Amino acid sequence: MDNYTVLRVIGQGSFGRALLVLQESSNQTFAMKEIRLLKSDTQTSRKEAVLLAKMKHPNIVAFKESFEAEGYLYIVMEYCDGGDLMQRIKQQKGKLFPEDTILNWFIQICLGVNHIHKRRVLHRDIKSKNVFLTHNGKVKLGDFGSARLLSSPMAFACTYVGTPYYVPPEIWENLPYNNKSDIWSLGCILYELCALKHPFQANSWKNLILKICQGPIHPLPALYSCKLQGLVKQMLKRNPSHRPSATTLLCRGSLAPLVPKCLPPQIIREYGEQILDEIKISTPKNMKKQDSNRVRRALGEANSASMQEEERGRKCSHTELESTGTTPAGNALERAARGNPESGNPQEHGRHTSPASPHRPWWERHGPSSNVEALEKASILTSSFTAEDDRGGSVIKYEENARRQWVREPPEALLSMLKDADLSQAFQTYTIYRPGAEGFLKGPLSEDTASDSVDGDLDSVMLDPERFEPRLDEEDTDFEEDNENPDWVSELKKHVGYGDGPGGQLLGERA
């Protein structure tokens, strides 16, 4: 700390503090994360710094250095002087963002997410509070304290550290999650940018979870285009395999031609080749460009005629994520990076073909009643838990990631535990404690009176069939992570004393 002067505290959480510091040698300001080091988890706490140091991308908060002093780990990062995206949304006070601004920010976030996914990293806590802005228009993804570094592209994720408003359906179902779980959270951010509120609001855990899993999505304001509405719906599909990957979002459909426009020339010159390579999607063998019939045959589409009709009649519920051999964003970036913007025949780069994925299980379409049962009598408050929070940021690398057979909890389990539960500050917390709290689930973007009627009936959340429709694009890549303790619902029961009396703690805050 000898080379740094603390200017002020800019954030605080269960991990410790976030400080604005001045580096005396360079007279530059940086953000410094101060993490308490416990003897039992010192190595684990250091892994966030190791992971962050590996991420070099214009849309990821840059790592400066890390060091230890007096029982603390200090991670020095670039300071984003525009604050976080949550603060920016709240500053609007109901005034909608222009669509061009939303798309510019969203594409930059997607570029950052795509970068970490290409490196087999799951962020696990993507939310508007963890997206940072600069005064010169850059958007950067930060806070990798919950991230996991994977050693294999195909493994199941079993534990989840995140924020309830952004938790995808598969987690409430006690099912494994993968990179598409990050995409769900990304969809929630896009909805917040458009509507200035959370996509799902309720006054009970039961209805919140049911809405997340099967309820309809409240339409975006009429100001925004049909394509933007469809993009949100694609990212909030219940089945993870039906959600587009970050690469698909960037290289196909309406976002593709906008990617070069969201990056200043300096960034394109410095990172153009890297970004171009990251947004490539492998072309199936023997597939000719611009031949839609060959694309359909290569992807195993059973009914070409019906697919053509669906494409012609596509409305707001679908995005333009067709399987094509060319990517507009890639071509534009390559021309800019090579200093030849008028060239129409950019040199082909080698494509990386993803390994064949094992057969994926079919996801049932009913609500996550097991989780709702398990949390029936629990209340939620802002308090931190546990060893995972106390040890600060952590990254765990596994050498073996074998797929497992997953056994679902009985439908009554979580519903029973959540019955009569009160909700408070679920945006920041994931803690279950004994009943006694007042209030309802209220996040920073919640309306003053959160009613279940916002996006569903008070007593019954209607199923939205559109959220169960598969995407047309089947050429996509998923990767997942593994953990030695797969069943978080069982752990939840232990902490809340399910079956042995009233509750206790479950999970802690990830600020």
From Swiss-Prot:
Phosphorylation at Thr-477 regulates its catalytic activity. Residues 299-370, 443-511 are annotated as: Disordered. Brain. SMART domains: S_TKc (SM00220). GO terms for biological process: cell division; establishment of cell polarity; neuron projection morphogenesis; protein phosphorylation; regulation of tubulin deacetylation. The modification N-acetylmethionine is found at residue 1. ATP binds at residues 10-18, 33. Residues 472-485 have a biased composition (Acidic residues). It is found in: Cytoplasm; Cell projection, Axon. The active site is at residue 125. It catalyses: L-seryl-[protein] + ATP = O-phospho-L-seryl-[protein] + ADP + H(+); L-threonyl-[protein] + ATP = O-phospho-L-threonyl-[protein] + ADP + H(+). Residues 4-255 form the Protein kinase domain. Its cofactor is Mg(2+). One of its GO terms (cellular component) is axon. Residues 309-321 have a biased composition (Basic and acidic residues). It holds the Pfam family Pkinase. It comes from the Eukaryota. Belongs to the protein kinase superfamily. NEK Ser/Thr protein kinase family. NIMA subfamily. This is Serine/threonine-protein kinase Nek3.
